[in-house]
Each structure stands twice: as C-alpha cells, then as structure tokens.
From Swiss-Prot:
This protein is involved in the repair of mismatches in DNA. It is possible that it carries out the mismatch recognition step. This protein has a weak ATPase activity. SUPFAM superfamilies: DNA repair protein MutS, domain I (SSF55271), DNA repair protein MutS, domain II (SSF53150), DNA repair protein MutS, domain III (SSF48334), P-loop containing nucleoside triphosphate hydrolases (SSF52540). PANTHER family: DNA MISMATCH REPAIR PROTEIN MSH1, MITOCHONDRIAL, DNA MISMATCH REPAIR PROTEIN MUTS FAMILY MEMBER. Belongs to the DNA mismatch repair MutS family. It comes from Geobacter sulfurreducens (strain ATCC 51573 / DSM 12127 / PCA). It holds the Pfam family MutS_IV. Transmembrane segments: none annotated. Gene3D superfamilies: 1.10.1420.10, DNA repair protein MutS, domain I (3.40.1170.10), MutS, connector domain (3.30.420.110), P-loop containing nucleotide triphosphate hydrolases (3.40.50.300). SMART domains: MUTSac (SM00534), MUTSd (SM00533). PROSITE patterns: DNA_MISMATCH_REPAIR_2 (PS00486). This is DNA mismatch repair protein MutS. One of its GO terms (cellular component) is cytosol. Keywords: ATP-binding, DNA damage, DNA repair, DNA-binding, Nucleotide-binding.
Length: 871
C-alpha cells in the first residue's frame, strides 16, 4: 500500500467500502475503473482495457474509463448485465485544493434503483422488492424509486409471497443475509432467476429498528400512522428497503412520501399460472405486449397512465362500490365522444410527472426536466375546465383533486429559459430578469465582448495595421496579433506575449484589465447560474408530495379515458357487477382474439355459471374447436368487469369473484425440475386448496399428461371434488377429451354438459365455434390431424387403428389389434405403468366403469356383445 500513489490509495480505500460494486472513480473529465473492475467492465462495455503503473513496484494496474458527461449509457449497460455501479465524485474543486482531491461515493446504481429515463421502459415500473419471512406470515414491500410508488402487504404463505413477486415483477429482490445460502431464493429459482438478489444484515429486521426507520422517514409518530402498524413482517420488509436506500442513495428521497399498505383480499387474486395463461401482460408464445390484454386495453397517452393500467389489470377490485365508481366514469366518457377526446388530447401533452418528480427529489433532474414539468402544468387549467361538467363521482373527485401547482409553474417559467442546454455547468439556463446580479454580470460580459470589437478597430486605426487582430484562446487569454511584416509599426505600450512563425502576439494594460473583467464575469455567470438552478430545483422538490398527488390523479383519468376509448371502438358494454353468485354473459367474445382478427367475424357465445344448477360446466369437443378460447374469454370478461372496464359482450352480469384460477396448456418447468404432468398436478392441487364458492375455476384437459385410465381417474376425481366439497365449490368451466366425464351430469345435480358444435360434410369437419348444451358425440381427432397437414397415409392408418379400438378387436394378451404385423423374436410390449395399484385386466376395468343405472336396454345389449367379444 505504501508503494502506491496517493490517488490509488484513495481509490482502494473507497473500493473497500463497496466490494460488490463496480466503482466509477471520477478523475477530471472521466470515470476510471481499475483492477478487477476494469477487467469486468471492459468486457461488458466492449471498451479498451489498458494498464498503468500506479505504484513503486513496477506492477501494471488494469484500467479503463468512460467520459463523465456521457456515462449514463455505460452505467445502464452494466446494470442491465446485473452489476451494481458505485458513482464516486470529486466533492472539492480541484483548483482550490493542494494535493489529492476529496472523493466520495454519492450513489450506488443497482437494477432495482435505476432512475435514468433512458434506462427505463416508460410504461413499466422498475421495482425493488423486499421479502421478510416470519414464523407464519411473509412481509412483501416494493418500491419504484423512479416514481416514489411504495407498497407493502403480508401473505400467509411462502407460495403467496412468491405469487406477489411474480405479479410485481421486480428487477431486484432484498432478503435477509441468512438466506443467501440455500434460503428463500432457492425456493423459487424460476422467479429469482434474472433478478438481482441482494442481502441485508439481520439486525436491520429488528422490530425496534424497523419501527424507527419508518417513523423517521415518513415523519410520523408511529408505524400505524405510516399505514403498516398491523403488519409486523411487512414493517420489517419496508425497513429493509429504507435501509438499503440509506446505503445507496446519498441524496434526498422526499418524493417517497406515502406508503400504500394493502391486503391481498382487497383484490381479485390471480396466481402466477393464471396471469400467464390468460396472457394479461404478455403473450405466452413470444412474451410481447401485443396480443395480451394489456396490449389491447392500453390506449393511455401518458407513461404514468400506462403503468397504472397495468396495476389495475393485475389487481382487479372486489369492492362493488369501487368497481361501479370506475364503471360510472367510463360510461360517462363513452357516452360523450367530444368530452372523451378532449380529455385525451389535454393529457397527451403531459410528461411523466412521477419520474420527473423522482429525479427532481433525487437532485438528478436537468433544466430540461423542469421545463417538461412546467409544460405539463400549463395544460392543467384547460383540463380542469373540460372536467367541470363531469357528473360521475370518480371524475368529479379527480377534477377536484388536481392541484394546478401554479406556484411551481410560475417559478420555473420565471427562472428557467424555455429551451435550456442539456449540460448544467456551462450556463445558459437561468432566464433574464430572474436574478439582478446575474443580469449585471451578463451585461458586463456582453459589453466586454463589444469592447474587444471596438478595441480592434481602434488599434487598426492607431497603428495603421489593417491585418491587426484581437483574439482569444484558453491558454493566453485575449491578445493582439500582428504579422512580422508590420512589427515596426507597433506602439510602445504593446507587451509581447508569444512569438509565432509569421506573427507575434501582444497585450496592452487596457486589454488585460478588460480580459480579467470579462473572463471573471463569465466564470461567475456559470457558477451563479448553477447555484440558482439548484435553488429552483430544491424549491420544486419541496412540493414533491403535491406533484405526486396530481400525477396519480392524472394517471387515473388517463386510464379511464383509455378504457372508454377501447369500449367505444370495440362495442363493449357496461357489465352489471353485484354481490350475486352468478356469472351470466350473453354474446360474449374474447377481447384479444376478436381484435387481432378483425377481418373474420368472431362467434359470440353465452355462458351461465352460478352456485346452483350451473356450478360445474363440462365442455367436450375436438381440439381447435374453440374450447380454450371460450373458457379464457369468460375469465377475461370477469376480470375486465372487476377492473372497471366495459366488456366484449351483448350483455353481462357478474357476481364478484374473489379468485380466478386457470389450469390451461402444458409446459415443463425445467428450472424447478418438474415435468409437464407434475406442473399440471401442482397447479391443480393449488386450485383445490385455495378455491372458494366465490372463485372462478378454468380447467383445460386435466390428466392428459399421463395414461388414459390415470387421466380419466384424476379428471373425474377433481371434478367430483370441486362439486362435492363445500369449501371449494367454485364456479367451474371444465374442458376435457374424456367423454366419460359427461356422466357426472347424471350423478351430480350442479353439473351441466356443453360441447362445441361441429358440422360434418364430405368427410370434412367444420368447427362452428358455438357452445351448445349436451356432450360431444365424437372427438374428431383424425379430422383435426388432416387439417394440420399429416400425410394421407398416416390419416388412413389412424382410421384403421381407431376402427379396431372402437370395435374392441384385441390381439393376443388383450392388446388392441393395431399393429399390422410382428417381427420374429420381438419382445412383448409392456403396458404403461399406472399411477395407481391396478390389478384388474381390461375386461374388469370396462365393467367397473359402467353406470348400469344410466343404461338403456339397447345400450346394455350392445355393451354385453362388446364384453363377450373381449373374453
């Protein structure tokens, strides 16, 4: 250490405090990185790695660097690669310091603490999430530093906590240090993957410390006053976030002024699987917004409105009063196109006030950010005027809650020029007339420059040297330049400063005096402008809570207007939402499928579900007929209604549901080492554990991932359980290829059979996509295979095998006669192992599966003939 230069010793001391971050060490106009940081950063950033001898032992030290004025994209790239970046600035003026300049880390940028606009998706939140597992509860707190959005809740299980993680989709997760090795992150590696996991010392979660952190940050007397007093685990999760901010953000975070505590029971609960299966935020296939419900409904014109819409979709309401408040507002906007378009036009020029407010509070806002804030505020009076006649409760409340922030608008308008430069420390920011001393200095600067022009003309006249020039450069300042051929004509008061090849440069006492005056004024102008800008920014930051409230109201208004615009264009209707137990939809349509296929008429369908005769609807029919689309559309219509949106239907009445479960599709979970069938069974188990009579359950092809008999058995048992178990007798749509399940309608009084209508013509099948009562008579699998393009030879052979199976023709050993031949010495095929201990042969299984009470005499004779041929 003693052999290192003072600068490198300083670097290593600071680096020791931030071992897990890449240290951006400010040296003049560059951020330098050294040693391992340099090696890692040069690889990620694809910049040159060099070396320099910084010590007395002759060892080279790896280094790389980036310009400080364009560091943002480099920082963003490192953070995107999962790195933390510690920004170390010079906190003293190098000109006024002898020796080493004092440096400090002013902030640490992590994936969950990004505030730079260019690094953030405008309509996506960037959350830092904190998990704290208690003995019987989990605390979940999450913060978007860029907007100040801070929320906390508690769950009663680890699964529910991780479901919140999936919904929030944070960039970074905080957990207690004790969980670093095989702890909470290892419980759900699929959800932890792709996110930075950061660990916090155990003492931070101490109850007294947590309480003190919350009280001090929010300036309240107790945690109860902050909104999370009844959430012990939630309080500790919040404290971890606040502690992490203290460690990483040295500036003020006053825009984080409100903590929203909520109970998951306040919203319609959607687990991770259901959110994915319904494609709420992104499609299953490519993960894009287009093709998702969010992609369809998002006609918001502001970034903050887009973020709020996503929150509404992922957290639908269960309060009938709040749902109908939203529906009233949407209805008013749908009914008056001029009103709706006027509101949307007024909002269209509003910038992202939430993120502007965040940058202002964190002292990272530019002058252009302040101008953008003012440009947004000047639109508010006309917007409020538009809202004056609003009759719905919610629109009126939003109108009355919008703060014009006239004082903020006036301050920025008076203090900042309309088109300021990007760079803050080069002047040109503060408006003329805002500050008298600045105006005087500018006058001196302008007059001084005019004096130089007059001096040049004066000296040309005095010396008779027409080529004489008065110029300036940063090395010599102002000077008079005379060519060597004219040196004999210079006056005696010229003082030589520099000799060139063809000319010489001089100064005069008068020129030197004005140089000091002019240059002193320009330096003072830049210094004073920056100080005045900081003062304006701080005064605006002091109004951060007012700005945040207005931003929230504008975002809500934007969402309502967007939902109204979609409803108008797509002929959606207002649903009736009440406390009843029925879901009745007439002429329902899948919102996304309909929108993406405008050239083809969507076949609308009706549905009735309730806790009476229509509790469990068994839907049979071939693949591609539309079963999955129908079931998803029912779930989406319910979700849209409880979001406060109009719905794609001719008429809809929705009894509020508490949860929506979907078990649709098949996929392995390789990260958790689970097969398709295991994923299916785990999701089904979660439904049976958590469903209530208020829930909506959508099940598609339960049991298809195993053998036929096992699959039928599981599907049948699941259906019976949902019907017979009072605790979880949810309204259920149950699609299946197992036609045996249609028998449930005979033995269970709340089961109803439906199928997807199909028309056969010339050995072809036409899917009518209409849901009709009754069970399907055929599966049409071979016809679907033909439509998919299988070779005709395969189709014909499939028909032959199907015929043998249906006629019960069996070969030796009870195996269906499907093989055309058997090679000599071939081993006898082994049947697929069952999940259950089955000792019965095929004959016994067939007999055991008969419902004798439901057979007609003719059906009984036919089955007896079939059994005789099997013996």
């Amino acid at each position: 250490m003693s052999e290192l230069t003072p600068m490198m010793r300083q670097y290593l001391e600071i680096k020791a405090d931030h071992p897990d971050a890449i240290l951006f060490f400010r040296l003049g106009d560059f951020y330098e990185m050294f040693l391992d940081d340099a090696v890692k950063a040069s690889r990620i950033l694809d910049i040159t790695l060099t070396s320099r001898n910084k010590g007395g032992d002759g060892a080279d030290i790896p280094l790389c660097g980036v310009p400080f004025h364009s560091a943002a994209p480099y920082i963003a790239k490192l953070v995107e690669a999962g790195e933390k970046v510690a920004i170390c600035e010079q906190v003293e003026d190098p000109k006024s310091v002898k020796g080493i300049v004092k440096r400090e880390v002013v902030k640490v940028v992590t994936p969950g603490l990004v505030i730079d606009a260019e690094s953030l998706s405008p309509k996506e939140n960037n959350y830092l999430l904190s998990l704290f597992p208690g003995p019987d509860r989990w605390g979940v707190a999450y913060l978007d530093l860029s907007t100040g959005d801070f929320r906390v809740t508690e769950t009663d299980s680890a699964d529910a906590a991780w479901a919140e993680v999936a919904c929030v989709n944070p960039r970074e997760i905080l957990m207690p240090l004790s969980f670093r090795d095989g702890g909470a992150g290892s419980e759900r590696p699929d959800l932890a993957a792709g996110r930075m996991l950061s660990y916090v010392d155990e003492w931070v979660y101490d109850a007294e410390y947590a309480e003190r952190m919350v009280r001090n940050h929010f300036g309240v007397a107790s945690a109860e006053a902050a909104g999370c007093g009844s959430m012990d685990c939630g309080l500790r999760a919040v404290a971890a976030v606040l502690h992490y901010l203290q460690q990483t953000q040295k500036g003020d975070v006053r825009h984080i002024s409100y903590l929203q505590a909520y109970r998951t029971q306040e919203f319609l609960v959607l687990d991770e699987s259901s959110r994915r299966n319904l494609e709420l935020n992104a499609t299953i296939g490519d993960g894009k917004r287009r093709g998702s419900l969010l992609g369809l409904l998002d006609r918001t014109v502001t970034a903050m409105g887009g973020r709020k819409l996503k929150q509404w979709i992922n957290y639908p309401l269960v309060s009938i009063e709040k749902i109908n408040e939203r529906l009233d507002a949407v209805e008013e906007l749908v009914a008056d196109a001029e009103f709706r378009q006027g509101v949307r036009a007024a909002l269209d020029g509003v910038y992202d006030l939430e993120r502007l407010n965040g940058r202002i509070s964190l002292a990272s806002a530019s002058a252009k950010d302040l101008v953008a804030l003012r440009a947004s505020l000047v639109r508010l009076p006309s917007l409020i005027a538009l809202l004056t006649p609003a009759a719905s409760t919610l629109l009126a409340r939003l109108r009355d809650g919008i703060d014009l922030l006239a004082d903020v608008e006036e301050l920025i308008g008076r203090g900042i020029v309309p088109d300021p430069p990007f760079v803050l420390r080069e002047g040109g920011i503060i408006a003329q007339g805002y500050h008298s001393e600045l105006d005087e200095l500018r006058s001196i600067s302008r007059e001084g420059k005019g004096f130089i022009a007059r001096l040049e003309a004066q000296e040309k006249a005095r010396t008779g040297i027409s080529s004489l020039k008065v110029r300036y450069n940063k090395v010599f300042g102002y000077y008079i330049e005379v060519t060597k051929s004219n040196l004999s004509a210079i006056p005696d008061d010229y003082i030589r400063r520099q000799t060139l090849a063809n000319a010489e440069r001089f100064i005069t006492p008068e020129l030197k005096e004005y140089e000091e005056k002019v240059l002193g004024a320009e330096d003072r102008i830049v210094e004073l402008e920056y100080a005045l800008f900081q003062d304006i920014r701080q005064r605006v930051a002091a109004q951060g809570e007012r700005i945040a409230r207005t931003a929230d109201r504008l975002a809500t208004l934007d969402v309502l207007a967007a939902l109204a615009d979609v409803a108008h264009d797509h002929r959606y209707v207002r649903p009736t939402v009440d406390e009843g137990d029925a879901i009745v939809v007439t002429g329902g349509r899948h919102p996304v499928v309909e929108a993406l296929n405008r050239s083809e008429r969507f076949v609308a369908n009706d549905v009735q579900l309730d806790n009476g005769e229509n509790q469990l609807v068994i839907i049979t029919g071939p693949n591609m007929a539309g079963k999955s689309t129908f079931m998803r559309q029912v779930a989406l219509i319910v979700l849209m209604a409880q979001t406060g949106s109009f719905v794609p239907a001719d008429e809809a009445s929705i009894g509020v549901v508490d949860r929506i479960f979907t078990r649709v599709g098949a996929s392995d979970n390789l990260a958790r080492g689970q097969s398709t069938f295991m994923v299916e069974m785990m999701e089904t188990a979660a439904i049976l554990r958590n469903a209530t009579p208020r829930s909506l359950v959508v099940l598609d092809e339960i049991g298809r991932g195993t053998s036929t008999f096992d699959g039928v058995s599981i599907a049948w048992a699941v259906a019976e359980y949902l019907h017979d178990t009072e605790r979880c007798a949810a309204k259920t749509l149950f699609a299946t290829h197992y036609h045996e399940l249609t028998e449930l309608a005979v033995t269970r009084n709340r089961v109803k059979n439906c199928n997807v209508a199909v028309k056969e013509w010339n050995d072809q099948v036409i899917f009518l996509r209409k849901i009709v009562e009754g069970g399907a008579s055929h599966s049409y699998g071979i016809q679907v295979a033909r439509l998919a393009g299988l070779p005709q030879e395969v189709i014909e052979r499939a028909k032959e095998i199907l015929h043998n199976l249906e006629k019960g023709e069996y070969a030796e050993g009870g195996i269906p006669r499907i093989a055309r031949g058997k090679r000599a010495g071939a081993p006898k095929p082994s049947p697929q192992l069952s999940l259950f201990d089955q000792g019965d042969d095929l004959l016994r299984r067939r007999i055991a599966g008969l419902n004798i009470a439901a057979l007609t005499p003719l059906e009984a004779l036919n089955i007896l003939d079939e059994l005789k041929r099997m013996v």
